[in-house]
Amino acid sequence: MAYPFSTIEPKWQKYWEENKTFKTVEDKNYPKDKRLYILDMFPYPSGDGLHVGHPEGYTATDIYSRFLRMSGYNVLHPMGFDSFGLPAENYAIKTGIHPLITTRKNMETFRKQIKSIGLSYDWDREISTSEESYYKWTQWIFLQLFKKGLAYEKEAPINWCPSCLTGLANEEVKDGKCERCGAQIQRKNLRQWILKITEYAERLLEDLDELDWPESIKIMQKNWIGKSTGAEVDFALVDKDGKETGQKIKVYTTRPDTIFGATYMVLAPEHELVKSITTSNQEKAVAAYIEEAAKKSDLERTDLAKNKTGVFTGAYAINPLTEQKIPVWISDYILISYGTGAIMAVPAHDERDFEFAAQFNLPKIKVVAGAEEWESGKRDFSEEPKACTTEDGYSVNSKQFDGLKTEEAKTKITEHLENLGIAKRAVNYKLRDWIFSRQRYWGEPIPLVHCPSCGIVPLNEHDLPLTLPQVESYAPTGTGESPLAAIDSWVNTKCPKCGKEAKRETNTMPQWAGSCWYYLRFIDPHNNEAFADKEKCDYWMPVDLYVGGTEHAVLHLLYARFWHKVLYDLGLVSTKEPFTRLINQGMITSFAYMRKNKSLVPVDKVKKISETEFEDIETGEKLEQVIAKMSKSLKNVINPDDIIKEYGADTLRLYEMFLGPLEVSKPWNTSGIMGVFRFLEKIWNLSDREIYKTPVNDTSTPETKTLTVLLNKTIKKVTEDTASLNFNTAISQMMIFINEVSKHKKIPHYVWYNFVKLLNPYAPHLAEELWQKMGNDESIAYSHWPMFVEKFCVDQTCTVVVQVNGKLRGKFEAEAGTSKEELERLALSNEGAIRNIEGKEIKKIITVPDKLVNIVVQ
């Protein structure tokens, strides 16, 4: 009989919605260890809707949540939308339609698609970051950051996207290009709001060790934070006669042991001392260089492959340990944002310094000898090195520190510099403060005003939310001002402090702002008095399992950790970290077709010749089938709506989980869906067989014993695999179970009853229908998860090897624990043994219970 998924699935989706089956309340009867918060990274509601990659993570958390509910847990499993962002604004610029209208329309599409997959979210907790009732609290949290001194205004060189016409955080730039649109980034000085994430660098680093996250993500965050230890050293500037001027250049170095090899210094073009130390005859060249450097992104400036450029300032400093006068240069390979924006250049032991010295014919002094070189007895290192060496070794050309190993030399030389009063130990981070403002319309307004008398003043909290005004044009100005700056009626306001004329801040917050804390709003989404009730936060937090893509490693995940720690310091949350466990689902890829020149051909331009042969329809060129990311341009995006229409949501759910382990990327192959559909169809048809009553775990007949053993093994396997998120192997075991059960014309009630429960998290629509078909009035969603009996999970039979004089002659099956005498009898009656002992005298029989019988003959 055909499996009527198109009738069953809407029926149960309607039932769940009308009965609020998955509504969650803070029931204090559940102890803390029986409350679990399972969260998906919420989607941006684009106009394209879902593709089959989205349901992978959503289905995984849904299976796990359904399993946990049946296992006696109170589960919080919500869904919402990260709805501020550039795509909706760009669409508004083209069409004139307000972003809120398109965003709400897109959310409706997403909501409909998500519900059609049968995901057990508590929809009463739905949130949207662009709704005023939500961003009121995003603004409120920003004000707490501002009052705590963690938000400051500064004119700074930023990453400017000439296409999006807005500033970007460092984390939003990939390979010198805008992460969103791919345009080449420019550098531009703009007034910005910046958050002091660097104040939390050490805690963000240390607390990673407490998290059950993929090691690769932790490493990415550690590298981004980039902690290093070293020393800050002062180099005195001198005039042309070698007399100290009173000015000093402070450098940060991780290699104080190499200071004897510092032969010149380099300042970032933006360094505050450049103007004052540049000599008159170098002013023109220095000014031209600074102007050129300002046009480059940090990535361009630090590209290891580019030729080193620079200009001599005309100034000199004194190396404090060699007492030699060394020139001071400026170069764009030094960034003002790292360390002190100045370096002591040691060309013999730093590749960039070596290249710069070679370019400008500056001296190189070797001060570290390799272990092999030193241990060979060589002591003359006066010759200028022809190559740079960066590995540790022994100090040379370093006066009293010669012969010290690198680590000891670092310590001793730092102590010596400290004793001279010109250095101190220091820790540095690559992490930069977060450029928080955007020069766009569709984002949270920053709740501050600029008052001529009072300066920057926060809005009163009772005046939140500060809402976005209606505008005629959503287009960014391109001048660095937000479109909001043109709305005089909105910009002009009264100072909350003195009541005089003032102007609103016109920059808006980045898309990341709303997603920094959304997991907290899910806990208490309708609270008008606080972002979330503290008691409810204590009930649910931290998030026990967070599932999403690796692309958020140093953006959302780092920002959310930062905001959470601020809220923790303010006493507003009780946990130091928001997300205890993180899993990154693998990408679902698709097939693409590649020409010899490595370019890809859209799927609709490909002709399939055979399972392994493909050609370009237009040119006839043979094509290679490859795995690639789904993309609209390649026409290989799969819409889940199409799959659900043809095969059903349960088929989609099972297929995506059956493709392979959750964390591994795997290719979508529509032809593979049919096997999963037939599996569900087989289950449906089995439900029409006779289901008869018999004692639970009946072993009174060979048939019931076989099914009892199979059921208990299946319960154990599916339980363990679901608990460990190994969904593909759990499905495989259920397939084995159904294949065996289908051999039986009638099925014991307890066997079918418990299997339907196992099926429920994976194929909930079908499970609900089968559950009702068995006479149950309530939903299966909160029925008790089946328990297995361990004795039935141990193999009941074993394979016994038969040997004659130590050589394998046969095998037979026997029940585990069969007596020695019975094993010998069975071995002697084995055909292989009979052939090899005929006409011979049996001297002895050696038996290893459950394993082998060796017949010794002569």
Swiss-Prot record:
Catalytic activity, reaction form: tRNA(Leu) + L-leucine + ATP = L-leucyl-tRNA(Leu) + AMP + diphosphate
The keyword ATP-binding belongs to this UniProt entry's keyword annotation: yes
UniProt xrefs under InterPro entries: aa-tRNA-synth_I_CS, aa-tRNA-synth_Ia, Leu-tRNA-ligase, Leu_tRNA-synth_edit, M/V/L/I-tRNA-synth_anticd-bd, Methionyl/Leucyl_tRNA_Synth, Rossmann-like_a/b/a_fold, tRNAsynth_Ia_anticodon-bd
Presence of keyword Cytoplasm: yes
E.C. no: 6.1.1.4
Predominant cellular place of this UniProt entry's protein: cytoplasm
Residues that, per the record, bind ATP: 632
GO function terms (MF aspect): aminoacyl-tRNA deacylase activity; ATP binding; leucine-tRNA ligase activity
Top class in the EC scheme: ligase
One CC-aspect GO term: cytosol
Motif interval(s): 'KMSKS' region: 629-633
Motif ('HIGH' region): 43-54
Keywords: Aminoacyl-tRNA synthetase, ATP-binding, Cytoplasm, Ligase, Nucleotide-binding, Protein biosynthesis
Subcellular location(s) of the protein: Cytoplasm
Gene Ontology biological-process annotations: leucyl-tRNA aminoacylation
UniProt cross-references to Pfam families, sorted A to Z: Anticodon_1, tRNA-synt_1, tRNA-synt_1_2, tRNA-synt_1g
Top-level taxon: Bacteria
CDD domains, sorted: Anticodon_Ia_Leu_BEm, LeuRS_core
NCBIfam families: leuS_bact (TIGR00396)
HAMAP family reported for this sequence: Leu_tRNA_synth_B (MF_00049_B)
Family, as annotated: Belongs to the class-I aminoacyl-tRNA synthetase family.
Protein name per its UniProtKB record: Leucine--tRNA ligase
Gene that this polypeptide is encoded by: leuS
